[in-house]
Amino acid sequence: LPDLVKAFGFPCINMAGFEADDVLCSLAVQFASEDVHAYLLTSDKDFSQVVGPNISILDEGKGGRRMGVSEVQDKLGVLPEQVVDLLALMGDSSDNIPGVPGVGPKTASTLLGQYGDLESVLGAAAEGLVKGKRGANLVEFAEDARLSKRLA
């Protein structure tokens, strides 16, 4: 694949120990500016965390539909800066991120809408503000959620 990429005149970047999505997101953040808009062609929701005024996703699964901040919020129910916390709560099987048992996408986005970030959600659960089995799981699996955030 690297030879094919080079044959089309594109640079090929390899960084040992880093996944391609991490490298692409880092490059997008580094090069995006008032004068340069970065576009990431992907359907991977992990990339949503870097979307901002000068970085957009072209969702290949939706015919190249452009996704900015409002589209990420519509699709995932959270702002781009909350995507890592969303993944930490709900998990992501494609990236082996376990998340918290019993917390899916809707619950995770609702909790983040109420409390703002992962640590505030976990704090609210520890204080008994998140009721039932869900609250108990957030307390029991708090360290797993923190690990999931580092993995995301």
Where are these regions (language model features)?
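Extended two-metal-dependent nuclease catalytic cores across DNA- and RNA-processing enzymes
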Residues: L1-A152
